[in-house]
């Protein structure tokens, strides 16, 4: 969301985001929200069968649409989780309308579950939490941003300090746990997926 500026618009073509993002976006009023900084938000809900509402997505994309956020996990909703293939189809549709729109995927709970990740099917950025899949159940805190360098750099400038960017950052003495989590994550996620199948 660090790539948004006053006057820009954030669009969710997969319905309402996690409850925890409502105050960040400004769906529920909050100091320092995107809405307070002049960023507007719109969403297009999924169709009742869980498919994308391509007709209304096309209508929703306009000259102010700067960033499209795609939440991969169903979160607290009853909709199905989005596969990487479906995400790729949606991104392709969006890029055919506006190639310059930034497509960001909230990849929480999706890491290591499929052979491909959203960056491999056209996403400009993926973001997620290290306390979920990539942390392997060990990482006590943290998050990640990956994707095209210019967009990641914009996030780094916002999340640390302008001019400093990703050269510094808080580790809270957790570096060892973070690396251990990344090391164990593929095994932990594979075990969870295998267990969930039975």
PLM region descriptions:
Residues 1-190, 194:
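Conserved PLP-enzyme active-site core in the AAT-like
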Residues 198:
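Glycan-recognition surfaces in beta-rich domains, encompassing non-catalytic CBMs
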